[in-house]
Amino acid sequence: MMLHIPGVLTKEQVAQCRDILDAADWTDGNATSGAQSALAKRNRQLPEGSPAARAAGDAIQDALACNALFFSAALPLKVFPPLFNRYAGGDAFGTHVDNAIRLLRGTDFRVRSDLSATLFLEEPEHYDGGELCVEDTYGVHRAKLPAGDMVLYPASSLHHVTPVTRGARVASFFWIQSMVRDDADRTLLYQLDTQIQRLTAEKGGRDASVIALTGIYHNLLRRWADA
């Protein structure tokens, strides 16, 4: 499932993150690439664990912790600390798949990459190109979202970023280990939770159908969750 999550950051929060990022030193994006990705990747990136990356990343993690749609869709168990990249002057990232396991440098913190996330930090009208293109059974899905919006998609997906030919595309990217590793199971739970929330708004939390469906949701989560 590929999902657009609007307004993860407010415009004010985006501006605060950009103040941090624009004052930072950027390095070759291949610092975090696997062997396959390094062949296709051309961009700039904030060094992993740098003060700027930590400060902006903490702001994003705080926002995610308050985002009900993110929790419903991802069912996060672990979130890899957000990283940041910048594409300009023809930079692009060819078709690749993300590594299955991400290790935080200098620690024993590991994340199985069930989901990938890209949080846009530049308005789409300020640059040309830079679309995130995610492939699945049904074709290629493109994302170029307003600043503060995020796209969430299975980390097993082939994907690429088209060349940026004007301006600069700035974004955060990171990976999530879900409590439910299977994408189809996780999608079913998200769809069920969405309908439960709709019925709750219509009928109230004491309605018998709401209570029954909530029980089914939690029993499925109990069956499928790793946690």
Swiss-Prot record:
| Cofactor(s) listed | Fe(2+); L-ascorbate
Give the residues the record marks as binding 2-oxoglutarate. 169
User: One Pfam family this chain carries?
Assistant: PKHD_C
What does the record give as EC number?
Answer: 1.14.11.-
Alphabetical list of SUPFAM superfamilies matching this protein: Clavaminate synthase-like
Q: Which domain of life is it from?
A: Bacteria
Which residues, by range, are in coiled-coil regions?
A: none
Molecular function terms in GO for this entry?
2-oxoglutarate-dependent dioxygenase activity; iron ion binding; L-ascorbic acid binding
Where does the chain bind Fe cation? 96, 98, 159
NCBIfam families, sorted: PRK05467.1-2, PRK05467.1-3, PRK05467.1-4
Write down what this protein is called.
PKHD-type hydroxylase BPSS1206
Origin species, per record, is: Burkholderia pseudomallei (strain K96243)
